Amino acid sequence: MESASLAGPSSQPVFLAENRNLRLFTIFLLYAGQGIPLGLFDFTIPAWMAVSGASARDIAFVVAMTGIPWSFKFIAGFMMDRYTLLAMGRRRIWIIGAQIVMIALLAIFAIISPGPRDVLILGLVALAVNTATVFQDVAVDGLTVDILPEEERSMGGALASGGQVIGIAVSAGLTGTMVYAFGASAAYIACALLVVLVTVHVIWVRERVGERRLPWSRGEAQQVNILAQADHWLPLLKGALRNTFSRQSLSYFPILVSVGLTYGICLIAVPMIATGETGWAEDQLGSLNGTAQLVAGVATIAIGG
């Protein structure tokens, strides 16, 4: 397959369904956007807590609160498939809304500025921001399925996986340095500004010709979206249960649990060992995590695309 350019087009149409390069660039950018809070809460905050002397139990609590919303993605999926503003496309209103909530929460928590020993508040911060991120993630998954033709699925999948990892890399490296030099509030603000950039792009593009850019703009729902929109909850529930408990889905369950357990343990153990045994600071851990994630992201795109 011919490799797609990741540069945002300037003179071509801003409709995702009509512009291949824009489609693929947007998929990459949106998945990178959801990696931004993950880099902060999976890597930088645990490292910051460990450097400040927090216990493994406290770090585990924050990591667990970060992961809880990701266990309930199906709820977000139900809501998006049932309710949306079709005149803006099936997914854009949810993506824009979720990212605005992410930005607002990060700004609020930058003002509140909980310390490394404020474990309950940090856990609630992680829970709130990641809940918004889950809605963004599910909406982007849906957008990817809606707009990518079959021949672009391989490249789209590589850009999705690699984009998220690169977003984590940028976030982990940047926020690790920000926390070390300026404090945690600066890291929250840095993440919020990165999400702002992604949000501006999503507001600029549209899914299909004739749709609205914003809720108050001129435009109308397209027939392909009207036909795809679910009118009742029951078919959605039946389809979700059928797919969840299919033989293929259940066969992946032990693998996913094993990967999740390993990942969670590493999120707690690595900062504890790095700070306790080697005396590393937040910026050093951020550089390590950022570099590792960047290499993984580039490799994913190169191999998968």
Language model: regions and residue ranges:
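C-terminal ends and interior cores of transmembrane alpha-helices
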Residues: 95-117
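Juxtamembrane intracellular "pre-TM" segments in multi-pass secondary transporters
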Residues: 5-21, 209-251
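Glycine-rich segments within core transmembrane alpha-helices of 12-TM secondary carriers
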Residues: 69-73, 154-179
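Pair of pore-lining "gating" transmembrane helices in MFS-fold secondary transporters
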Residues: 14-52, 127, 245-266
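Transmembrane alpha-helices of Major Facilitator/SLC transporters
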Residues: 68-76, 287-305
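Short amphipathic helix-loop junctions that connect adjacent transmembrane helices
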Residues: 37, 43-58, 268-286
